[in-house]
């Protein structure tokens, strides 16, 4: 049917009503989605394919062709005006000549790599990770610094070219990059080196703060430590650590954490049909893994993480924003996620201690990392007793979850 002209293709769905046609499309889509999900449990070789460009007619997992055709490598051309219909001169694969790091000893073509089907990726990887490559180590060190201090040494982590911002401390960036390479590209050593430095361990206050704000308002000179707000992932993981729910297991398949119920049940289109509703992982041990392992649906972001500036997965984010908006406060006070974490924290403190005073102390230790002061202790104990009496008179409503949902699709 694919090979026939449109006017000669036989009609589809003969004898089916529009309702039956819609159900058939949804069922086919479900079959495709669940096949993809089941494939995640199959062993997979982390390898690359060298050969002519294979023809793929679907979005399922690519497999090695049984018979690799003996055809030439696809030619890459300069597109005149950016148009696919106007190919210009053919070009060969190569590396950035501006960095001055050659890939071959041929003086005529020092920056080109092989044009054969095998060896191109390896040649590029060796060039990127070459100790004399001036870009790779600096880019890595710049991002690690940004992770610890909230802002990078060079202002555009995604752009180390002439249009990017110049580093505020170029000699420091060069020294860290050189030391990183000389010591075997050890990330653990780099993190330790930064975190044990006097700059990292500075106080957030300065005796001449007003003078510094006039001379260096953005603290480019690093005269004092600027506090960094937790990222969305760190915030969620930190709450799970405090409540004792965090599953610290390393590796494995992505998990489906709990998200807002209304968002989870919203109809979502995928490949011209309805996608299955979002379903959290069955067991708490699965749901409460680190956010690093959370499965991200591009068309259905987690509203809590999105509210706290988790980047859009469709974009390349070089530096996160740290906006403070009113819905963040409401979410931290009234969201289902926070209510569940508060309940889990209370249950943990009751399990560890029977005495109310020790329970209050334990909660503050877990959340703030310190013991309560005298006035805090009294206020918190009085508040807990007040809430206990209130809840004895007013039982909380039982939470009920839908066991089935109905979603309709309108053909236009």
Predicted feature locations:
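Active-site Gly/Thr loop motif
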Residues: 290, 300-308
């Amino acid at each position: 049917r694919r090979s026939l002209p449109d006017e000669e293709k036989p009609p589809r769905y003969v004898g089916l009503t529009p309702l039956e046609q819609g159900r058939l499309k949804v069922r086919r889509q479900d079959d495709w989605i669940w096949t993809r999900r089941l494939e995640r449990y199959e062993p997979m070789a982390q390898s690359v394919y060298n050969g002519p460009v294979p023809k793929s007619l679907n979005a399922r997992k690519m497999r090695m062709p049984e018979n690799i055709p003996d055809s030439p490598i696809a030619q890459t051309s300069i597109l005149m005006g950016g148009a696919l219909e106007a190919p210009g001169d053919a070009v060969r694969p190569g590396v950035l000549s501006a960095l001055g790091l050659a890939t071959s000893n041929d003086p005529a073509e020092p920056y080109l790599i092989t044009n054969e089907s095998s060896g191109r990726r390896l040649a590029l990887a060796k060039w990127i990770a070459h100790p004399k490559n001036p870009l790779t180590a600096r880019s890595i060190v710049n991002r690690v610094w940004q992770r610890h201090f909230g802002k990078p040494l060079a202002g555009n982590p995604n752009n180390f070219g002439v249009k990017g911002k110049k580093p505020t401390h170029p000699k420091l960036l060069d020294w860290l990059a050189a030391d990183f390479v000389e010591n075997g590209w050890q990330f653990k050593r780099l993190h330790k080196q930064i975190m044990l430095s006097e700059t990292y361990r500075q106080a957030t206050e300065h005796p001449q703060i007003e003078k510094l704000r006039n001379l260096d308002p953005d603290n480019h000179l690093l005269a004092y430590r600027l506090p960094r707000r937790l990222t969305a992932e760190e915030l969620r993981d930190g709450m799970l650590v405090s409540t004792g729910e965090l599953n610290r297991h390393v590796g494995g398949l992505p998990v489906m954490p709990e998200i807002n119920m209304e968002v989870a049940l919203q109809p979502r289109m995928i490949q011209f049909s309805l996608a299955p509703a979002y379903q959290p992982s069955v067991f708490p041990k699965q749901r409460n893994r680190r956010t690093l392992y959370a499965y991200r649906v591009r068309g259905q972001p987690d509203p809590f993480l999105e509210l706290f500036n988790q980047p859009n997965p469709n974009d390349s984010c070089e530096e996160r924003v740290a906006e403070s908006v009113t819905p963040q406060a409401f979410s931290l006070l009234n969201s289902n996620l926070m209510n569940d974490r508060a309940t889990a924290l209370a249950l943990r403190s009751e399990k560890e201690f029977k005495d109310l005073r020790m329970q209050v102390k334990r909660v503050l230790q877990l959340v703030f990392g310190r013991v309560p002061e005298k006035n805090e202790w009294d206020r918190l104990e009085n508040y807990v007793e007040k809430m206990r009496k209130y809840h004895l008179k007013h039982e909380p409503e039982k939470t009920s979850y839908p066991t089935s949902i109905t979603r309709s699709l309108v053909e236009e």
